[in-house]
């Protein structure tokens, strides 16, 4: 990180760093080995046929907390070395998140969330009057599954970005 910042300064360039802690191009292949090896602490997403995927579930608080800790340490460091010169102008939080092989996660944690009522804040944002579970409000097709998964990915990334911005308030995007 320091070398990239120093080199950018020498060439009068600005930087947008990319953080891919939990996911990159849908997969969790760049997660640290201690995350990938501990599937009990960091469960994987499952297809509708219970096939495990190399995608950490967005429904794991353990994953979110570990991702936050590491991301916040990075943001502290960037602030310490760059808040005066502002070489780092933006941060991309995660990269191309989504599901492959299945429209949504069917892990036990995801299934529990799927059976819960759709959050009121989402219903309000979508200007929907209907209340109920995800299946009751959106149906049970692939598009409904994608809405469910997109909401929870967005919720995860929003929490991660907010934690980072609380440390060093630079623009962030997905």
Question: Language model features by range: what are they?
Answer:
Residues 31, 36-174:
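Polysaccharide-binding and catalytic clefts of secreted carbohydrate-active enzymes
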Residues 4, 22, 70-74:
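Alpha-helical scaffold elements adjacent to nucleotide-binding pockets in ATP/GTP-utilizing enzyme cores
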Residues 1-18, 24-33, 37, 48-55:
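Active-site-adjacent substrate/metal-binding segments within catalytic domains
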């Amino acid at each position: 990180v320091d070398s990239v910042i120093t080199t950018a300064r020498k060439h009068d360039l600005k930087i947008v760093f990319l953080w891919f802690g939990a996911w990159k191009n849908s997969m969790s292949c760049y997660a640290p080995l201690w995350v990938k090896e501990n599937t009990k602490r960091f469960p994987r997403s499952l297809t509708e046929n219970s096939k495990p995927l190399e995608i950490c579930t967005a429904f794991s608080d353990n994953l979110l907390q570990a991702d936050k800790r590491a991301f916040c340490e990075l943001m502290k460091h960037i602030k310490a070395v760059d808040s005066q010169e502002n070489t780092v102008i933006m941060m991309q939080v995660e990269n191309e998140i989504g599901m492959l092989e299945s429209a949504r996660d069917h892990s036990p944690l995801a299934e529990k969330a799927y059976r819960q009522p759709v959050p009121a804040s989402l219903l309000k944002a979508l200007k929907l009057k209907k209340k109920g579970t995800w299946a009751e409000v959106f149906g049970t097709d692939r598009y409904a599954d994608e809405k469910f998964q997109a909401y929870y990915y967005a919720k995860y990334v929003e929490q991660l970005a907010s934690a980072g911005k609380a440390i060093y308030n630079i623009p962030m995007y997905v």
